Amino acid sequence: MKNKIDYSIYLVTDRDLMSTNTLEEAVEKSILGGTTLVQLREKECSSHDFYETALNVKKITQKYNIPLIINDRVDIALAVDADGIHIGQSDLPATVVRNIIGEDKILGVSAGNLDEALKAQKDGADYIGVGAMYSTGTKKDATSTTMNELREIMKKVSIPVVVIGGINKERIKDFNGINIDGLAIVSAIIAQENIEKSTRELKEEFDKLNTLI
């Protein structure tokens, strides 16, 4: 599965922002709109609740054959047999996580600059999440990554790159010609009143990239 992943529209969940009654409903609507990858991020809940939520979300992602990535929690990822794990710079080292999860699961690593991106690739990451590209309410302590830094990362790494941080429909065109592999999106999907429609519009804008003159 790892070699055939479509990173184009990468939903990162946030329970506090969702417009729906349940997280499962939000995830399913986003998939129907064109989400190609789902990362379950639960920062506040107990391990038991995270586990139960992950099992429920996995039923939906499996139904549509969409990979499920767990944020930070290697134990939860293994417990529910998720497709992969995404870690930040302050989490367990990527080399350690790779040893724990094995070669078959997807490993994503956040990187804010070229050095972090190169180290992530060297340490066994399957993809890199670069950002924050813009200021964002979901990660108030995230430092911003410039477009020039992104271009440099794209030149130097050979694994897929997704951008994250304040991505919305209007900003997608900023990435024209940079050849990113995907958009990791939080509020522009999960906080929208019509999640399916919003996701579809984001996918349409992403598909226009690199074709604009």
Curated annotation (Swiss-Prot):
Pathway per the UniProt entry: Cofactor biosynthesis; thiamine diphosphate biosynthesis; thiamine phosphate from 4-amino-2-methyl-5-diphosphomethylpyrimidine and 4-methyl-5-(2-phosphoethyl)-thiazole: step 1/1
Catalytic EC class: transferase
SUPFAM superfamilies assigned to the protein according to its UniProt record, in alphabetical order: Thiamin phosphate synthase
Binding site for Mg(2+): 72, 91
Binding site for 2-[(2R,5Z)-2-carboxy-4-methylthiazol-5(2H)-ylidene]ethyl phosphate: 136-138, 166, 186-187
Superkingdom classification of source: Bacteria
Biological process per Gene Ontology, one example term: thiamine biosynthetic process
Molecular function as annotated in GO: magnesium ion binding; thiamine-phosphate diphosphorylase activity
Cellular component terms (Gene Ontology): cytoplasm
Cofactor(s) the record lists: Mg(2+)
Pfam families referenced in this protein's UniProt entry, alphabetically: TMP-TENI
E.C. designation(s): 2.5.1.3
InterPro entries: Aldolase_TIM, ThiamineP_synth_sf, ThiamineP_synth_TenI, TMP_synthase
Keywords: Magnesium, Metal-binding, Thiamine biosynthesis, Transferase
Entry function: Condenses 4-methyl-5-(beta-hydroxyethyl)thiazole monophosphate (THZ-P) and 2-methyl-4-amino-5-hydroxymethyl pyrimidine pyrophosphate (HMP-PP) to form thiamine monophosphate (TMP).
Family assignment from sequence similarity: Belongs to the thiamine-phosphate synthase family.
Protein name (database record): Thiamine-phosphate synthase
Species, as recorded: Clostridium botulinum (strain Eklund 17B / Type B)
